[in-house]
Amino acid sequence: MGRIIIFTGKGGVGKTSIAAAHAVRAASEGKKTLLVSADMAPNLGDIFETEVGGNAVPAGDNLYLLELDPDQLVRENYPNISKAMRNLFGSSGLALDNLDDEMIIPGFENLFSLLKIRDIYNSGEYDLIIVDCAPTGETLSLLKLPELLSWYMEKFYPVGKTMVRVMAPVSKAKYKVTLPNRKAMNEIEQMHWSLVALQELLKDPDVSSVRLVCTPEKMVVDETKRSYMYLNLYHYQVHGDFINRILPDDAGSDFMNHWGSIQKKYIRELESVFAGIPITRIAWYPHEVRGRAAIQHLCDDVLGDKDILNVRVHTDNEIYEACDGGWSLTIRLPGAAKEDVTVYQHEMDVNIKVNNFNRCIPLPNTLTGAQIDGWDVADGFLRIQFSKKADGQDETAEAGKDGK
């Protein structure tokens, strides 16, 4: 079985260099490795000092590089969706001839990069796929899309498909608006099932894992902690944290030693947050990581004899348990504060909102008729209590900021 390792972190922390070092190590061990960039501003070519494009290119024995172009993937794999969207907006009086597809659904095009990675994995061509993702904010938005879109497809697509078929003639004749045709709707349905498979793949702890990259400074550490919390919210496995650009103990001047003491404070904070997760410290090099020799040096220095590629720290992000008078659902939310969390229920779905991120979890059939009785956030876990619903009670229950 192949593996997928996703590297992400705040922009400028060195995630591409560290992903490249892992790819070089894996290739040297005889694993056929693909290092793929899912960033809209890729720089694999800059680091390896070679031309990289939309097709995999060799970069040494067992090592291949690929920079994905989402617009090209949409045109090649879902031409009818793209055409339908242009017809829909064009018939509404908007001139789209000079606009890229990404302007139609902002941010949505990045999803096709993940779908392409799934296709590459399913081909079995590579032993290991290392993904250099966009900065954490974009990556989190991207990783939550498969689950979010799958939920909407399951809830609303059957009705929407029927309405489009019925309304298409009227819409075109009376309002001059061209709705998606049957081919486009079939592609949307095909994409839905691809999203379901993608979600299962990315959340399979035996296949996929996420590695976070950061530097020991306040803004980066705060974002890394939030990313770790949100990744747990969406049930992704985080198997490592790489702390980059660490100053030596004696940096040679009072100014640098002062910054070194600040870094140590944030390193201790990260070690507390990522307890149980492997943490790798990386020195601040006097030169930029560029070219195969520099990547190899980083690989030898950082990875050494460690078997980092096979690290698997499986955690149960969602645990259902029977308890007195009902059931409980426990979800890992490391670093979450109760005031940042809202939980409410609609029918057989539980919605969890943490700051600006929202996740909808369909409840198992065992909890049919149950409703939220209360919830709490403590010690890095969200615990939701369910009890049997009284007859005639409203099926929509909300637990507000106080958890009641």
Label the predicted regions.
Residues M1-R3, E125, Q237, Q371, ...:
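Short loop/turn motifs at secondary-structure junctions
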Residues M1-V13, S17-V196:
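Nucleotide-state-sensitive switch-loop elements of NTP-binding domains
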Residues I6-T8, L34-L35, Y64-E67, I129-I130, ...:
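Structured core elements
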Residues L195-K338, D349-N351, N356-N358, P362, ...:
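C-terminal lobe/tail of nucleotide-utilizing enzymes
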Residues A322-D324, Q345-H346, D376-V377:
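Generic beta-strand structural signal
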Residues E339, T368-D391:
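Beta-rich strand-turn-strand
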